[in-house]
Regions:
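Class I SAM-dependent transferase core
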Residues: 20-113, 124-125, 129, 142-144, ...
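Positively charged n-region of N-terminal signal peptides that target proteins for export
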Residues: 1-6
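Conserved nucleotide-cofactor-binding alpha/beta core module
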Residues: 105-222
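Bacterial N-terminal signal peptides
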Residues: 7-16
Length: 241
């Protein structure tokens, strides 16, 4: 897929996007109908942009992104752009969420680790595909908020905890896939160790603008492949306890 040079595939921006003003009030039923229509339009856009996995597209169609953004930004929830969620963090651009999920090649029955829960949206998309999702968020307020939304929406296969993502979740390892939604300078070794053989880790690596990196674990080591340029917030925490 080819993009104009001016279009960066942004995962999580370092800045807040301004709102577009007040919107007319709709009845709850009409509002939900509008959200459903916008979700269908977004999924059609993702398909035309190169997302080909039907299971991923189905997950993106099912998960209500508007539930994971602040109320003042809900009218922008199905635009293909990141949005602020507070604490200098953002919810990722839907294309990036779909891209990372597709790259992870998650099958039903598998166990997934997410580093960087944020508002919980990526975890919800992963949970539509995986048997179990374990998600770590270093900012307590975001972890609490994500847990509340996910519980309200009925996601029983997601566990969120507050902690240092660099260390992973060793007591739940190994994981069939690991999705990292913040950028470390280098691939965290603890996460590689917690990846199952034949599992994949999707992680933006570097400072400033990063390269999305797909790591596949084999019996003899790891295979690392760099793909698209992205801009994620830096990963918070440290590689050692």
């Amino acid at each position: 897929m080819t993009y104009p040079a001016t279009w960066l595939l942004l995962g999580v921006l370092l800045l807040s996007w301004p709102g577009c003003g007040s919107q007319p009030e709709l009845s709850p039923a009409l509002q939900q109908e509008q959200y459903s229509k916008q979700r269908r339009e977004l999924v059609a856009e993702l398909r035309s942009d190169g997302i080909s996995s039907q299971s991923v597209l189905d997950a993106m169609l099912k998960v209500p992104r508007h539930e994971f953004v602040p109320a003042s930004y809900r009218h922008q929830a199905y635009q293909n752009r990141p949005l602020p969620i507070g604490h200098d963090q953002t919810i990722s651009q839907p294309y990036i969420v779909a891209y990372m999920t597709e790259a992870a090649e998650i099958a039903s029955g598998e166990k997934v680790l997410e580093i960087g829960t944020g508002s919980g949206y990526q975890a919800a998309v992963l949970a539509e595909l995986a048997k179990e999702v374990y998600s770590i968020e270093i900012i307590p307020e975001l972890a609490d908020g994500a847990r509340a939304v996910l519980n309200r929406l009925g996601y029983k296969n997601i566990e969120v905890r507050t902690g240092n993502g660099y260390l992973g979740w060793p007591e739940k390892a190994p994981f069939d896939a690991i999705v990292v939604t913040a950028a470390p300078d280098q691939v965290p070794q603890a996460l590689v160790e917690q990846l199952a053989v034949r599992g994949k880790m999707i992680v933006p690596v570097g400072t400033g603008f990063q390269q999305m990196t797909i790591i596949t674990k084999t019996e003899s080591g790891v295979i690392e492949r760099k793909t698209i340029p992205v801009a994620f917030v830096p990963m918070v925490g440290k590689p050692t306890p």
